[in-house]
Design a protein with these regions (language model features):
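Aromatic sugar-binding interfaces of carbohydrate-active proteins
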Residues: 161-165
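N-terminal amphipathic, basic helical "cap/leader" segment at the start of enzyme domains
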Residues: 1-100, 208-212
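Short, flexible, mixed-charge acidic loops at enzyme active sites
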Residues: 69, 104-112
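Acidic, glycine-rich active-site loops and adjacent beta-strand->loop/helix elements
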Residues: 99, 152-155, 177
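Small-aliphatic-rich amphipathic alpha-helix that forms the alpha element of a beta-alpha
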Residues: 39, 93, 109-160, 171
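C-terminal helix-cap and adjacent tail motif
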Residues: 2-19, 168-212
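Short hydrophobic/aromatic-enriched beta-strand-loop microsegments
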Residues: 73-76, 166-171
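Short glycine/serine/proline-enriched coil/turn segments at secondary-structure junctions
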Residues: 44-47, 138, 179
């Protein structure tokens, strides 16, 4: 059983984005099944279906997606950007919109407007956020590293791969390259001539209150 101390350590590490990977290894099949359980057994409003998840291990597709992610800006003027290397992970989980028209209405809005148009977008994004969080934490509890990608760029590539399906976000999951700092680009030191380039790391201060 996990102790509070060990769980807090996992929670702390789970927020960190891994930027390089050991691609000589593969995600264990039993772990992949557990990751699938994580995204299919998390809460959503009225247990409504909002998304589906594609777990990609095909390296050709993963590298195609990665090439389209040159949106991490490290210099604003003149603009210089590099790719989001977290997408080069051993496995990439892609969250895609999925609305089951066969479901009957579960809310008043769905009853009035139909089960497709009646869904509230904010409920959809909440559901995806919860599922992505479940997946991220589960991956870390299994011993993997992760990195989120918002999938807001490279639309032509996403259209080619996924068709007109709406992509919410992606999560790279896998084994880290133990020879590098986690924020070193996967392709360093050959990355665009940027020797020793390291992604920046930002912090946040979440205010927590306790009312008794």
């Amino acid at each position: 059983m996990l102790t509070n101390e060990s769980l807090e350590l996992i929670l702390t590490k789970s927020q960190r984005c891994q930027r390089n990977w050991d691609l000589s290894r593969q995600i264990k099949e039993e772990d992949l099944q557990t990751l699938k359980t994580a995204v299919t057994n998390c809460p959503s409003k009225q247990n409504v279906l909002f998304y589906k998840v594609i777990f990609i291990q095909n390296r050709e597709i993963i590298e195609q997606i990665h090439r389209s992610t040159d949106s991490f800006t490290y210099n604003f003027e003149p603009r210089k950007a590099t790719t989001n290397a977290q997408i080069l992970a051993n496995t990439v989980a892609v969250f895609i919109r999925d609305r089951d028209d066969a479901l009957g209405p579960r809310t008043e809005k769905e009853y009035a407007e139909g089960t497709t148009n009646g869904k509230i977008d904010i409920d959809e994004f909440k559901a995806v956020g919860i599922a992505a969080g479940y997946l991220n934490l589960t991956a870390h509890m299994l011993g993997y590293k992760t990195g989120f990608y918002g999938a807001q760029h490279g639309h032509d590539t996403l259209l080619e791969i996924f068709g007109k399906q709406y992509v919410f976000c992606m999560l790279g999951i896998g084994y880290p390259d133990e020879t590098k700092h986690r924020r070193d680009h996967h392709f360093n030191p050959t990355l665009e001539g940027l020797k020793d380039y390291r992604y920046s790391s930002l912090s946040k201060q979440v205010h927590v209150e306790e009312w008794k």
